[in-house]
């Protein structure tokens, strides 16, 4: 199961540029495979990315299919922000306001 970062108040999911197993860069959901690893590394990762208030983020568990559909909705573009409702268990994307 993938474990992802969610902002507690806004329900935003942490997205960034990643590299797939083919060595290709893509824009998607930052994830860990193991819960223990996610819990241990999340805070330091957020700090390394200069995220303000890393304490406002939590690790949540997703189904693999939920992560896949969320990455598709991001359209490999950083102009989209991803939000996740634990009630509906569906992703919502919003265009980044500049």
What are these regions (language model features)?
Residues 13-41:
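Short, flexible N-terminal segments of the mature chain
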